[in-house]
């Protein structure tokens, strides 16, 4: 069974599988679900959340719905755009005031799938206890704030380059460069198209 599979329009058992919540886009994984998860994440993790996505067809739709949920409960949103999950995790860990993150991705699943993965303040995936609390708030519902308490959203640029720079700083780039390696890269339509070419160049 695929982690996060839905039964009868809602999950049987735990909402979160081994890698977040996953389902078929515009069926199980739809805008209403993403918006409600956004509200629940804002209620559990806090009011300053970073969000990123992969390049799947449904990712922009789901990211916007999730961000709407976050904003509606008073959470401020930092939109990193399309970057790999580790780049989001590093951003959450490095920047003071960021209390968590959400990645719109279904990893290696077929293209019709998408998913929502929650990141804790230390840059790791949320604990089971945090996921259980997010699910509890999802099921119970989270009330939106008044109009003058709605959160604010920002687009954050240069995240991919910052992530690449941090990786290069951890290796002997000159040694690799002098080796004269010839590398063939296939990003396979994934998020790494935003970072891997920069890294190899």
What are these regions (language model features)?
Residues 54-61, 109-110, 189-193:
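Gly/Ser/Thr-rich loops at beta-strand to alpha-helix junctions
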Residues 69, 90-95:
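Short, well-structured alpha-helical segments in soluble
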Residues 80-89:
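Short acidic loop-to-helix transition motifs that present clustered carboxylates
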């Amino acid at each position: 069974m695929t982690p996060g599979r839905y039964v009868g329009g809602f999950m049987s058992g735990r909402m979160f599988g081994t890698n977040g919540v996953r389902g078929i886009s515009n069926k199980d994984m739809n805008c209403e679900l993403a918006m409600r998860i956004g509200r629940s994440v804002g209620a559990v993790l806090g009011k300053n959340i970073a969000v990123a996505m992969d390049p799947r067809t449904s990712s922009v739709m789901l990211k916007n719905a999730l961000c709407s949920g976050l904003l509606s409960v008073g959470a401020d949103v930092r939109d990193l755009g399309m970057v790999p999950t580790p780049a989001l995790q590093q951003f959450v860990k490095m920047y003071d005031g960021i209390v968590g993150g959400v990645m719109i991705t279904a990893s290696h699943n077929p293209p019709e799938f998408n998913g929502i993965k929650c990141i804790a303040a230390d840059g790791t995936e949320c604990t089971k206890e945090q996921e259980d609390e997010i699910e509890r708030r999802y099921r119970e519902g989270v009330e939106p704030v008044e109009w003058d308490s709605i959160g604010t959203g920002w687009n954050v640029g240069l995240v991919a380059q910052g992530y690449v720079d941090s990786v290069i700083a951890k290796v002997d780039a000159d040694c690799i460069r002098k080796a004269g390696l010839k590398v063939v890269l296939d990003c396979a339509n994934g998020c790494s198209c935003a970072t891997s070419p920069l890294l190899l160049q």
